């Protein structure tokens, strides 16, 4: 039986660390990288008699997410105790949400693949709920024992649960990337996967093509890169298919992915909800979100990627590809919008070309984010404007861009004037240069008249060289054709 006889079913649970300054139920700092246990309050270490106090900022970030995905923001939601024992969980339970989460439903549209084979798909979300993170067990520096760091205990998380709507690792990665971009766009999570701010758990099962019943799922825990997510799913899918075809059965389990071997390995048998004995936390009142509170958060929301993409297409005349690329991250979209604001909507397309082309390449080479680009939106807009009004050619523009990057002038105009780069558009001056080139390159002239088009390009190159790149390429082409025709 071939792989094509099987259908893959994937659902993702993503833990997004909310970017509040303090923890969800205490005033302790959430800053990353502190010495062990210096950011753990009495609440975090579960001293007797302490009570949790809900962080308003964490709730507002959950509301923001719910609004961004078109979900229902619950007027009333409830915190519950998820009971289990682990050394880095001092209370013996985790405060989470179970029956009544703060965000219910919602959708995210993803784009899978590139070029002609690309397609869009809508992934439904089940819920997103607030919860606290656990601490961290430390094994490396200890022999015969483990250390516990409770700095992370109580850090606010939004657990975002999708429906099992994805049918390939490519779709799962596209969903994770889109979600990652969204939480950063609406500024609820910094998305730093290396620091654990955005972690994915993948629930994977397989079933025969055409079957309605889901197969038994296995959950791959704590995937902290998109590459590992894809590799882990691909391995797990093949393992499940091979196991079933060899006569085995899949047992529900939690597994870990080993990046060194590219394999998943069993961690423990998978628990169901009843194993955690959820019940409402008696120390926390139900969370009530009034219509006024929700409306205020709505009023503070930025323009969302899909809305901005549609506006770029409809109002600025960009292609769907360009609009999608420019709205892939908030930083790029903000830079591009500022460039167009300075240059004018009529130059939206050349501005897009420069942001996606030369600027992106230069930033990539220098390993810089666009937010700290040495060339500002206003400077790039000035450069695009000088190309548009034929002050400089595209070739000269690249030199001006490099000069702006290196800080050799405050604006394109200043560099053009200082370095004498203004394009030569005087027909008489260009004709004089053409005459000199034709006189010195009789062989190329004869070859052109014999039907060799390459000879024409060689002559254009000689004229541009004679003008030190300053002659208008369009005028050179036009005048040279006339001369050769005569």
Curated annotation (Swiss-Prot):
Tell me the domain of life: Bacteria
Q: Which InterPro entries match?
A: Asn/Gln-tRNA_amidoTrfase_suB/E, Asn/Gln-tRNA_Trfase_suB/E_cat, Asn/Gln_amidotransferase, Asn/Gln_tRNA_amidoTrase-B-like, GatB, GatB_C_1, GatB_Yqey_C_2, Gln-tRNA_amidoTrfase_suB_CS
Question: Which keywords describe this protein according to UniProt?
Answer: ATP-binding, Ligase, Nucleotide-binding, Protein biosynthesis
Chain segments annotated as transmembrane: none
What Enzyme Commission number does this protein have? 6.3.5.-
Spell out the PROSITE patterns in the cross-references. Answer: GATB
Q: Does the keyword Metal-binding apply?
A: no
Q: Which SUPFAM superfamilies match?
A: GatB/YqeY motif, Glutamine synthetase/guanido kinase
Annotated catalysed reactions: L-glutamyl-tRNA(Gln) + L-glutamine + ATP + H2O = L-glutaminyl-tRNA(Gln) + L-glutamate + ADP + phosphate + H(+); L-aspartyl-tRNA(Asn) + L-glutamine + ATP + H2O = L-asparaginyl-tRNA(Asn) + L-glutamate + ADP + phosphate + 2 H(+)
User: What Gene Ontology biological process does one annotation of this record name?
Assistant: glutaminyl-tRNAGln biosynthesis via transamidation
Q: What's a single GO MF annotation on this record?
A: ATP binding
UniProt lists the family membership as follows:
Belongs to the GatB/GatE family. GatB subfamily.
How is the subunit organization of this protein annotated in UniProt?
Heterotrimer of A, B and C subunits.
- Report the PANTHER family cross-referenced here: GLUTAMYL-TRNA GLN AMIDOTRANSFERASE SUBUNIT B MITOCHONDRIAL AND PROKARYOTIC PET112-RELATED, GLUTAMYL-TRNA(GLN) AMIDOTRANSFERASE SUBUNIT B, MITOCHONDRIAL
Q: What does this protein do?
A: Allows the formation of correctly charged Asn-tRNA(Asn) or Gln-tRNA(Gln) through the transamidation of misacylated Asp-tRNA(Asn) or Glu-tRNA(Gln) in organisms which lack either or both of asparaginyl-tRNA or glutaminyl-tRNA synthetases. The reaction takes place in the presence of glutamine and ATP through an activated phospho-Asp-tRNA(Asn) or phospho-Glu-tRNA(Gln).
What is this protein called in UniProt? Answer: Aspartyl/glutamyl-tRNA(Asn/Gln) amidotransferase subunit B
């Amino acid at each position: 039986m071939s792989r094509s006889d099987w259908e893959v079913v994937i659902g993702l649970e993503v833990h997004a660390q909310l970017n509040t300054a303090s923890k969800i139920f205490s005033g302790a700092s959430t800053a990353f990288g502190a010495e062990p246990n210096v950011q753990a309050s009495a609440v975090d270490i579960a001293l007797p008699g302490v009570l949790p106090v809900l962080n308003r900022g964490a709730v507002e970030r959950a509301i923001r997410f719910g609004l961004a995905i078109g979900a229902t923001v619950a007027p009333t939601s409830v915190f519950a105790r998820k009971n289990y024992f682990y050394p880095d969980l001092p209370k013996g339970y985790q405060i989470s949400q179970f029956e009544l989460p703060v965000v219910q439903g919602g959708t995210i549209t993803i784009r899978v693949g590139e070029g002609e084979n690309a397609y869009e798909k809508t992934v439904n979300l089940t819920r997103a709920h607030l919860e606290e993170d656990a601490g961290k067990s430390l094994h490396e520096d200890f022999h015969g024992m483990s250390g516990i760091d409770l700095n992370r205990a109580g850090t606010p998380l939004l657990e975002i649960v999708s429906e099992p709507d994805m049918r390939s690792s490519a779709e799962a990665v596209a969903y994770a990337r889109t979600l990652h971009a969204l939480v950063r766009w609406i500024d609820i999570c910094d998305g730093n996967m290396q620091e654990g701010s955005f972690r994915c758990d993948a629930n994977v099962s397989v079933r025969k093509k055409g079957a309605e019943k889901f197969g038994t799922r296995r959950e791959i825990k704590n995937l902290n890169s998109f590459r590992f997510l894809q590799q882990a799913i691909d391995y797990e899918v093949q393992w499940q298919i091979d196991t079933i075809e060899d006569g085995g059965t899949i047992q529900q389990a939690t597994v870990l992915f080993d990046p060194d071997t590219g394999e998943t390995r069993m961690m423990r048998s998978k628990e169901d909800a009843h194993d955690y004995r959820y019940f409402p936390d008696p120390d926390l009142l139900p969370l009530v979100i009034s219509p006024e509170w929700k409306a205020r958060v709505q009023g503070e929301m930025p323009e969302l990627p899909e809305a901005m993409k549609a506006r770029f297409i409809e109002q600025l005349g960009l292609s769907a590809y360009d609009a999608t690329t420019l709205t892939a991250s908030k930083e790029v979209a903000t830079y591009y919008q500022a460039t167009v604001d300075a240059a004018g909507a009529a130059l939206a397309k050349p501005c897009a070309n420069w942001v996606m082309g030369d600027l992106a390449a230069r930033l990539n080479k220098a390993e810089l984010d666009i937010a700290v680009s040495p060339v500002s939106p206003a400077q790039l807009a000035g450069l695009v404007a000088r190309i548009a009004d034929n002050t400089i050619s595209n070739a000269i523009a690249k030199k001006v861009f490099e000069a702006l990057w290196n800080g050799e002038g405050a604006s394109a105009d200043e560099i053009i004037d200082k370095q004498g780069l203004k394009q030569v558009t005087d027909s008489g001056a260009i004709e004089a240069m053409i005459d000199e080139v034709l006189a010195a390159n009789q062989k190329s002239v004869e070859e052109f008249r014999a039907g060799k088009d390459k000879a024409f390009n060689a002559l254009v190159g000689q004229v541009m060289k004679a003008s030190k790149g300053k002659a208008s390429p369009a005028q050179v082409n036009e005048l040279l054709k006339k001369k050769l025709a005569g």
